[in-house]
From Swiss-Prot:
Retina pigment epithelium. GO terms for biological process: G protein-coupled receptor internalization; signal transduction. GO terms for cellular component: membrane; photoreceptor inner segment; photoreceptor outer segment. Belongs to the arrestin family. One of its GO terms (molecular function) is G protein-coupled receptor binding. InterPro entries: Arrestin (IPR000698), Arrestin-like_C (IPR014752), Arrestin-like_N (IPR011021), Arrestin_C-like (IPR011022), Arrestin_CS (IPR017864), Arrestin_N (IPR014753), Ig_E-set (IPR014756). Binds to photoactivated, phosphorylated RHO and terminates RHO signaling via G-proteins by competing with G-proteins for the same binding site on RHO. May play a role in preventing light-dependent degeneration of retinal photoreceptor cells. SMART domains: Arrestin_C. This is S-arrestin. It is found in: Cell projection, Cilium, Photoreceptor outer segment; Membrane.
Length: 405
């Protein structure tokens, strides 16, 4: 008995995400919501669809994968552009099955668990697509969110035309997934920057040195910033301030450029004339501290499992313009220096040090591929909490349609 208890504890449960169409004709099952982009290759979307044989009789069942970029501004149509652009679309027929395909371990376990009316599908990402990223709207913003999202859709239809307007909504189900990048195994050189400024009526310059302990940090990890100020001037450095700045370049449509502080720390330690100070300021950039501000998030599945966007890694030779939004990070250290008239003429000087912010590699990738059907835990694939105006309108339309059917 004790051995059985110990065995059950050693084998973790595996959450399977499911979602069922309104008319119960199709139910889609996925083993994860996040798919890892390893730069040279991306994890495929493997899952199964359970069909009701009576409700899909005479119909075909398809599963599609769409990557779309939303610009987010309703007034963009004034200049003749759509504020949604599909970057990639792929579709496979799962019922009736077309040829025999090899099954993944997850699919084998799910088919064994769910029974004979379960059909596998496999959708792959090309290597040129961006990762999931979203410009978090400010509270006063309305309209579509700006960003890149990925949608998996399963639907049953008796029409040869599988266009969006031809698919019966009651027989379709949609899930938003994320494509994310994890930190590379090799780090870059330790970030370091030096700067000097010459001031009026001072013979010697003000020196600033900024260094980080490493080039790559994980989400939620404290970032110690070592600052050395060598003040050879006749002025006083009154304040030292360090910021983590998120740099987002929207390259697909407009080349908009956003620089937003996502973490700030400062010290009131003064550096008098002809003296030196070395201090360390620790910063922790978190999306939780930036909820009410416009900024960049990793995607919009749920509030609780979304981080600040990871730094973008681009495959060598790839066209940057199709990446949608390029994200990078930098540490900015800013000095406030006294002037001739005190506070009235104080000036600020600053320098930046780039670094990368990413997810760590999974601890044991092989363990994630082992499935035991008795350890499956099925969870409804709920829509994300961060809904934009279009999605709310769409859900309301679906509910109204259901009421009339």
């Amino acid at each position: 008995m004790a051995a059985n208890v110990q065995a059950s504890k050693s084998t973790p449960n595996h959450v399977i995400f499911k979602k069922t169409s309104r008319d119960k004709s199709v139910t889609i099952y996925l083993g994860k919501r996040d798919y890892i982009d390893h730069v040279d290759q991306v994890e495929p979307v493997d899952g199964v669809v359970l069909v009701d044989p009576e409700l899909v009789k005479g119909k075909r069942v398809y599963v599609s994968l769409t990557c779309a970029f939303r610009y987010g501004q309703e007034d963009i149509d004034v200049i003749g552009l759509s504020f949604r652009r599909d970057l990639y679309f792929s579709q496979v027929q799962v019922f009736p099955p077309v040829g025999a395909a090899s099954q993944t371990k997850l699919q084998e376990s799910l088919i064994k668990k769910l029974g004979g009316h379960t059909y596998p599908f496999l959708l792959t990402f090309p290597d040129y697509l961006p990762c999931s990223v979203m410009l978090q709207p400010a509270p006063q913003d309305v309209g579509k969110c700006c960003g890149v999202d990925f949608e998996v859709k399963a639907f049953a239809t008796d029409s040869a035309d599988t266009g969006e307007d031809k698919i019966p909504k009651k027989s379709s189900v949609r899930l938003l997934i994320r494509k994310v990048q994890h930190a590379p195994l090799e780090m870059g050189p330790q970030p370091h920057a030096e700067a000097a400024w010459q001031f009026f009526m001072s013979d010697k310059p003000l020196h600033l040195t900024v260094s980080l302990s490493k080039e790559l940090y994980y989400h939620g990890e404290p970032i110690p910033v070592t600052v050395t100020v060598t003040n050879n001037t006749e002025k006083t450095v009154k304040k030292i301030k360090a910021l983590v700045e998120q740099v987002a370049n929207v390259v697909l449509y407009s080349s908009d450029y956003y620089i937003k502080p996502v973490a700030t720390e400062e010290t009131q330690q003064k550096v008098p004339p002809n003296s030196t100070l070395t201090t360390t300021l620790t910063l922790v950039p978190l999306l939780a501290n930036n909820r009410e501000r416009r900024g960049i998030a990793d995607g919009k599945i749920k509030h609780e499992d979304t981080n600040l966007a990871s730094s973008t890694i681009i495959k060598e030779g790839m066209d940057k313009t199709i990446m949608g939004i390029l994200v990078s990070y930098q540490i900015k250290v800013q000095l406030t220096v006294s002037g001739l008239l005190g506070e009235l003429t104080s000036s600020e000087v600053a320098t930046e040090v780039p670094f990368r912010l990413m997810h760590p590699q999974p601890e044991d990738p092989e363990a994630m591929d082992s499935f035991q059907d008795e350890n499956f835990v099925f969870e409804e694939f709920a829509r994300q909490n961060l809904k934009d105006a279009g999605e709310l309108k769409e859900e309301k339309t679906d509910q109204e349609a259901a009421a009339h059917e």
